[in-house]
Amino acid sequence: MDKLIITGGNRLDGEIRISGAKNSALPILAATLLADTPVTVCNLPHLHDITTMIELFGRMGVQPIIDEKLNVEVDASSIKTLVAPYELVKTMRASILVLGPMLARFGEAEVALPGGCAIGSRPVDLHIRGLEAMGAQIEVEGGYIKAKAPVGGLHGGQFFFDTVSVTGTENLMMAAALANGRTVLQNAAREPEVVDLANCLNAMGANVQGAGSDTIVIDGVKRLGGARYDVLPDRIETGTYLVAAAATGGRVKLKDTDPTILEAVLQKLEEAGAHINTGNNWIELDMKGNRPKAVNIRTAPYPAFPTDMQAQFISMNAVAEGTGAVIETVFENRFMHVYEMNRMGAQILVEGNTAIVTGVPRLKGAPVMATDLRASASLVIAGLVAEGDTLIDRIYHIDRGYECIEEKLQLLGAKIRRVPG
C-alpha cells in the first residue's frame, strides 16, 4: 500500500491548475446512460473513482472511448446487462447514481448497496422512496436494490427530501428527465455539482429548471441525445490548496477554477488573515508570511460552509493564533483525523459534533493513518506545517479525490514524495 512522506517547514508558493470536480463528473457519467446517441464528457479528473465508473460501464457492456486528452465518449446503446455488481460498487458510493438512469431508460436496474468513505450512515432510502413516488417497484434483498419501472415507464411525481441529499437529488433528477409528465423535487440539494448535472442534462435535451434552488422542476421528455460537456472545476480541491497555502503562510495562484462557488470558504480564509484576489477562472491567496488566525466553522449544505472542507480547516486552526470551534452538522463520525493530528502535537478536543482547536506554533512529524478522503487531505496539510517527517499510510483515500496531489504540491515547493507499498 502506497504511503506519502512529507518533510514540513516550506511555505507553499507558485501556480497550479485545478482539475475537474469528481462530485460532478460521476453523476454526469451516470447521466450518459440516458442518451440514445454518444455523449462526450470533458475535463474529467484522473481519479480512481472515475476509473471505477468506467470499469462499471464496461461490465454492463458499454465500452467508453477515451481520446488523447482523456475525454470520454459513452455510447449506452450497447448496454448488455442492467446490474451494477458489488465488487465495484463497494469501493465507490457514487455507483448508486446509475440506478435512476438505468431505471428510466431501460425499465429496470439492479444495483448493489454502496460502499465508499466510512463517515457515518449515508442511507439510500431517499433514493428508493423518491423512485417509488415515480411508480417504481423496488425490493432490497441480498445486498442489492432491485428496481422495475411500471408498464409505460416512470411517471412524474412530487417528492420532498426529509434531509438534503446531493446524490438523492441527482438520482431523481436523472430518472425524472425521461419520466412521463412533471416531477417536482422539494428541499433539493443546491450544490454547484447538482447545477452542473442539470446543465448537462439540458444540453442532452432534458427540461430541468430550478437547479441551484431548493425546488427543482423536471418535465420529462421522450428521448435524450448526445452532447459534449465540460465538467466544472473542483471547488474542494481548490479549497484544499488554498488552506494548505494559508496554513504554511504562503502564496498560491490557482487556475481553471471558479471563485463564485467557493464564497463561504474564501470568506473564512480572509477571516484567517489571507489576502485574496479573484478573476473569472482564477484565485490568488497570499498570507505574506504570516501565521493564520483561528476561525470558527459550522458546516451545512451549500451555500453554507462545506463539510468536505472541515478537516482541512482543522489542520489550519491547529497551527493558527488563538482558538477556533468547528461544528459538524452534516455527517456524524467525521472527526477521526483529529486523533491522528493530536499525535502530531495538535491541541484538539472533541465534544459531540464540535472540535475545539487551540493553535500551537508548529506540529511535529509522525506516522499517521488516513481514515477517509478529506481526513487524508487534512493530514497532508498537517505534514506540511510540521517539523520533521510525516508518514501518511492508507493514501488510497487521497487518490479517490485528488488528482496528482504530490506533483501539484511539489510544483508549489513542498517536500513530498510517494513511497510504493
Swiss-Prot record:
Its EC number is 2.5.1.7. InterPro entries: Enolpyruvate_Tfrase_dom, Enolpyruvate_Tfrase_sf, MurA_subfamily, RNA3'P_cycl/enolpyr_Trfase_a/b, UDP_GlcNAc_COvinyl_MurA. It catalyses: phosphoenolpyruvate + UDP-N-acetyl-alpha-D-glucosamine = UDP-N-acetyl-3-O-(1-carboxyvinyl)-alpha-D-glucosamine + phosphate. The active site is at 117 (proton donor). Its main location: cytoplasm. The modification 2-(S-cysteinyl)pyruvic acid O-phosphothioketal is found at residue 117. UDP-N-acetyl-alpha-D-glucosamine binds at residues 93, 122-126, 308, 330. SUPFAM superfamilies: EPT/RTPC-like (SSF55205). It is found in: Cytoplasm. CDD domains: UdpNAET. One of its GO terms (biological process) is UDP-N-acetylgalactosamine biosynthetic process. Phosphoenolpyruvate binds at residues 22-23. Pathway: Cell wall biogenesis; peptidoglycan biosynthesis. Keywords: Cell cycle, Cell division, Cell shape, Cell wall biogenesis/degradation, Cytoplasm, Peptidoglycan synthesis, Pyruvate, Transferase. Cell wall formation. Adds enolpyruvyl to UDP-N-acetylglucosamine. HAMAP family: MurA. Belongs to the EPSP synthase family. MurA subfamily. This is UDP-N-acetylglucosamine 1-carboxyvinyltransferase. It comes from Pseudomonas paraeruginosa (strain DSM 24068 / PA7) (Pseudomonas aeruginosa (strain PA7)).
